[in-house]
Amino acid sequence: MKIASAFIHPEPRMRLEQQYALLYREFGERAAHPGLPALAALLACSERNARLQLAKMADRGWLAWRPGRGRGHRSELRLLLTPDEMALGDARRLVARGELEQAFARLNAPLRRQLLTRLPQLFAQDDDRSRLRMPIARPVHTLDPIKAYHRLEAHIVRQLFDCLCDFDAASQSLRPALAHHWEADADARRWRFWLRPGLRFHDGSPLDAAAVAASVLRLRDEDGPMRHMYRGLEAVETHHPLSLSFRLAHGDWLWPQRLYTVNAAIAPPARAADFDSHPVGCGAFRLQRHSPQRLVLEANPHYYRERPLLERIELWVLGGADSPSCFDLRQDAATRSPDDPLQSACTYLLPNPDGPFFAGDDARRRGLLRFLSQPTPLTAGDPEREPALGLLPGWRQPPVAADADTALPQGGALRLCTYDLASPPGLIRALEARLAGIGARLEVTRIAYPDFHRYRWWQQADLVLMSEVLHDDRDYGLYEWLGGNPGLRRSLPPGPRARLDADLLAIQQLPERAARMRAYQACADWLVREGWLLPLSHEREGLQAGDDIAGLRQGLSGWVDFRSLWRKD
């Protein structure tokens, strides 16, 4: 009987489990009568060692072995476990000891899925009230603040790092963080910040004005998804260890908000080669472990503000597998209801004006987007989403202004590109059904998340499906979306892009938030009316927590701040 081994990482020295796998491959589950010499030859050891190994396996309940004694009495061997059962048992013991990485490394993909189904029994044996476990759908690709773009990375970076300013979502206003005070000159071209004394990074190195200056200059000088947003920084001047100033090319009343974003989190000047995956931060949690299977955060005992209420947060990478209900907290839960909050922005379409279908024809681009939006392709009563009338919930943008005599081509194919986490099947089916009305076919290409943001696929795309989620500061979140989103900037030809940049430059010079919000709406009206961006839906944010989890404060990004979580008795 030949079977595939459950173990996929053999070691140079044969392990007991591998010896059992050899026996199972030779004899299977049937009763066998091998002599000790034959067993020693199979296990590549002496007869004495073979006898010892068989005794160990019998003690563990893997097999029953009765040696033959005397002439005519044959030995009898019966194997009681399949290698898969044995591998799972070994993995369960490792998980119970907290050795998740070793457990997964020893199993092939089907057995890993089986192990996940048995997690509830394993977790039930753990009564650690200071720990919280939650699943995540994919690995974390970077923990360097200036590279963080997706909200998973952004949220974890916010737990590991702090910024000069913090933001209160309830009042939609800035509050002190690493800096306890800041002020601007009359035209907002020069900003000065004063730091709290005694600040340190997780490794004990000082967090002073020089460290802040070096960290902020990275935003302007190093490659990152939001580098474009800091091009107006002309110079940084340190006055003394607790104070520094920023000189800007243009007046910018949004400068403190720029320094609140996750990309502006303060990193140490000296960074190890593995900083991208194992960073040293300054936030409420510090990184204890980062492996392909798990991310572990531990409370920072020297945090300058209120200490987190939990000691340990574990994020388990489950890939596409369904997460068992035994986890304490589940973000983006599959089961949603109309009572769940809507995401802070929307899922939307970007047309590629130079793609194969549009080929620079503006009338065709506007005509197709109007056809896709009038009426909404979504069906009523969908618990996971609502039709988007504008970029934000509650906003209403004008319809796409298509030319009356624009005739849509009948038939053909349009290629839609998206990334895995922004491709709700119901929404894509609705677009397919709408296009079928003109005999057109939608070819959907789902691109792995890191590759999506390299945009090497752009020239082959006609439409791009994306999703935007703002952070708690809705004001600067809109500015960042309109001015810094790489997909939107690629979709705009030079003329419209220059107009949007000019509008945003004017917005940053408005000192009042209300005036800026009106200006954002005007930008959104223009983008939608001209067919450069089409809001489709507002997704609902699913969040499920155990009955004993308290302190749930869900921000506009949909994530819960780990610092406020605690367990009820």
Residue ranges and their predicted role:
Residues 135-184:
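N-terminal lobe/hinge region of extracytoplasmic solute-binding protein
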Residues 298-301, 341-367, 371:
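A bilobed periplasmic-binding-protein/Venus flytrap-type ligand-binding module shared by bacterial periplasmic
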Residues 367-399, 422-430, 459-569:
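Detector for C-terminal structural segments
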Residues 76, 227-270, 284-289, 294:
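Surface-exposed binding/hinge segments that line
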